[in-house]
Structure formats: C-alpha cells, structure tokens
Amino acid sequence: MKIALCQINPTVGNFNAIRESITRYYKKAIDQGAGLVVFPEMVTTGYPPQDLLWDNGFINKNLNLVESIAKNSSVPIIFGFVRSVDNKLFNSAALCSKGLHHGTYDKILLPTYDVFDEDR
C-alpha cells in the first residue's frame, strides 16, 4: 500500500484556504497512487488555535470542514481536527473514506510544557 503523508502548514482559522489545500494535496496523492492519505494533527484549524477555540463558531467551522472532507472522500484519509463533547475539547483524528466518517481517535497525552497549551 502506498501511503501519502501531506505535511501542510495551514494558517490558523483560515478555513477556506485549509479546505482548498487539503483538497489539492488529497487529489494529488490519489493521482500518484496513494491507498491512504494522512494529514497532520489539527489540520482543519491550523496549529495552535489557542483562544480561537473559544470564539463563537470556530469549532463549528472546523466540524463543517470535517463533514466536507468525509463527504468528498474516496481513498481513506486520516486527518486531525478539534471536536467538542459536553463542552470538553479534544485533539482528534478522523478516518474517512467512500463519503463516510468511519471513526475518531482522541489524543490522550497532551503536551503542557513550553509553547504547548493543549491541556486547557
């Protein structure tokens, strides 16, 4: 199996540009024969989103992008996003293919040192 690792540098909160970049790299990977396409953690928001996570609509825009990626998927794709459950935020990874979001994995060990503030 050919696995494509798409290391992109999304601008935090620029959801339209992030969508375009993911779409472009995903299509390119498929065209080059990838059987699985992988993007970085929190690619749907950019990293680190910091206090933008608490801005009205930020999480929903991120989740709308997750739905769009899933809907337009064919070859399996794994990518990072932020999800909210009972007002608790998770740094998560989604697995999507054939137009469906098949599963989610939540990061367990969050860094809380130096420039990282994922514990908040």
What are these model-predicted stretches?
Residues 1-120:
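Enzyme catalytic cores with a strong preference for nitrogen-chemistry domains
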